[in-house]
């Protein structure tokens, strides 16, 4: 029954799961009692500029609405449902909560207000993403911006084009993908906007190898190869490719694996180098570091687009989102910091709100500094 669903897996019995049919989808997926099916986000759900967080939300491993998510819930979800140890996500979580406090203007404590605020540009979100457009990519005026939060098929295709015709890719391929994305963003962004975020993207490269390298290959731990169909399905659907034979790596990947893969990507020789590369794009990069309010963070409006889900029929029968209901509301449920509903046209009010929050934070920081002198 499932021979067509699992074409790349020789023996399903080798997996630590049985195979189950997802209700109403025609899709089989490895199943244990902790595995939940994909449910498309609705127009009022909050989603991040991050396919990992969005996949966890779409499967209900963190709150499906993408709001009020505790640090412990995030840690458990990555560990239990992605096979990613806490050591890997510690820095990213720290930065997420810093951005949460920055955007909302108050300490978020142990609960991330929502996923959407992570799209604040040049913070947790960054330029030259593998699958998102930059905040000011292709705009005509300095005050214009576009959706930098949702998956963008055209952008992701520029990543896939580098490895066209392959079933797997290695460190050198990933280095070429990385350089391609930097080059295109550098060319297409509004002049003066592009900021190279090499340390963050390096960690993301290692994360991709940690999550979707092909564990069916005998040398996967030492020389991992990313299975492209797994990567494509995960990013495009923001869902886990269970039906393609994927399951969370076991034992869970630790930070040592991710940093080793990241370093190997940067050290790998490439066969071609795109033009328009920013200075320092090639070669070793600096470490990713915790964000701080001491850094020059600037408040920006965030896009109010409805959450993405794949609807492209060319993706074929394995696309779980083809039957998902389309967003019909013209209201953005959030405004920065994503707590109140406003019309999508009400940008002036949103700008005023962001500015008032920034001014209040600046005053509080100045007062605190004066007290400490």
Swiss-Prot record:
Domain of life: Eukaryota
Residues listed as glycosylation sites in the UniProt record: 33, 114, 237, 259-260, 262-263, 269, 271-273, 296, 304, 314
Record keywords: Chloride, Cleavage on pair of basic residues, Disulfide bond, Glycoprotein, Heme, Iron, Manganese, Metal-binding, Oxidoreductase, Peroxidase, Pyrrolidone carboxylic acid, Signal
Cofactor requirement: heme b; Mn(2+)
Note on cofactor: Binds 1 heme b (iron(II)-protoporphyrin IX) group per subunit.
Enzyme Commission number, as recorded: 1.11.1.10
Modified positions (Pyrrolidone carboxylic acid) in chain numbering: 21
Post-translational modification: N- and O-glycosylated.
Active site (catalytic residues): 204
Gene Ontology MF terms: chloride peroxidase activity; metal ion binding
InterPro entries: Chloroperoxidase, Chloroperoxidase-like_sf
Metal-binding keyword on record: yes
SUPFAM superfamilies in alphabetical order: Cloroperoxidase
Catalysis performed (reactions): RH + Cl(-) + H2O2 = RCl + 2 H2O
Database matches in Gene3D superfamilies: Chloroperoxidase-like (1.10.489.10)
Its job: Catalyzes peroxidative halogenations involved in the biosynthesis of clardariomycin (2,2-dichloro-1,3-cyclo-pentenedione). The enzyme also has potent catalase activity and in the absence of halide ion, acts as a peroxidase similar to plant peroxidases.
Listed name of the protein: Chloroperoxidase
Source organism per UniProt: Leptoxyphium fumago
């Amino acid at each position: 029954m499932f021979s067509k669903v699992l074409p790349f897996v020789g023996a399903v019995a080798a997996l630590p799961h049985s195979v189950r049919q997802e209700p109403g989808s025609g899709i089989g997926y490895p199943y244990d009692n902790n595995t939940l099916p994909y449910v498309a986000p609705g127009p009022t759900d909050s989603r991040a500029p991050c396919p990992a967080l969005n996949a966890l939300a779409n499967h209900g491993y963190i709150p499906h609405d993408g709001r009020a998510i505790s640090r412990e819930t995030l840690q458990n979800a990555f560990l239990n449902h992605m096979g990613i140890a806490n050591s890997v996500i510690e820095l990213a979580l720290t930065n997420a909560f810093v951005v949460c406090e920055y955007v909302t203007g108050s300490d978020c404590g142990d609960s991330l207000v929502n996923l959407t605020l992570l799209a604040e540009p040049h913070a947790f979100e960054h330029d030259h993403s593998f699958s998102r457009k930059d905040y000011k990519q292709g705009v005509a005026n300095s005050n214009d911006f576009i959706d930098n939060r949702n998956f963008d098929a055209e952008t992701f295709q520029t990543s896939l084009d580098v490895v066209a015709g392959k079933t797997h890719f290695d460190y050198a391929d990933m280095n070429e993908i990385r350089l391609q994305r930097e080059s295109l963003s550098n060319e297409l962004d509004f002049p003066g906007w592009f900021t190279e975020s090499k340390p963050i993207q390096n960690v993301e490269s290692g994360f991709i190898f940690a999550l979707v390298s092909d564990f069916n290959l005998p040398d996967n731990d030492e020389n991992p190869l990313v299975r492209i169909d797994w990567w494509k399905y995960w990013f495009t659907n923001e869902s886990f490719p269970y039906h393609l034979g994927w399951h969370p790596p076991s034992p869970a990947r630790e930070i040592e694996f991710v940093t080793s893969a990241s370093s190997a990507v940067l050290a790998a020789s490439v066969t071609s180098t795109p033009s328009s590369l920013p200075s320092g794009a090639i070669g070793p990069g600096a470490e990713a570091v915790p964000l701080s309010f001491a850094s020059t963070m600037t408040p920006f409006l965030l896009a109010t687009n409805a959450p993405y889900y794949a609807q492209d029929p060319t993706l074929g029968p394995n696309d779980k989102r083809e039957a998902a209901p389309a967003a019909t509301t013209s209201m953005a449920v959030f405004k920065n910091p994503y707590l109140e509903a406003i019309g999508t046209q009400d940008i002036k009010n949103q700008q005023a709100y962001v500015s008032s929050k920034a001014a209040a934070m600046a005053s509080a920081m100045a007062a605190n500094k004066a007290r400490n002198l």
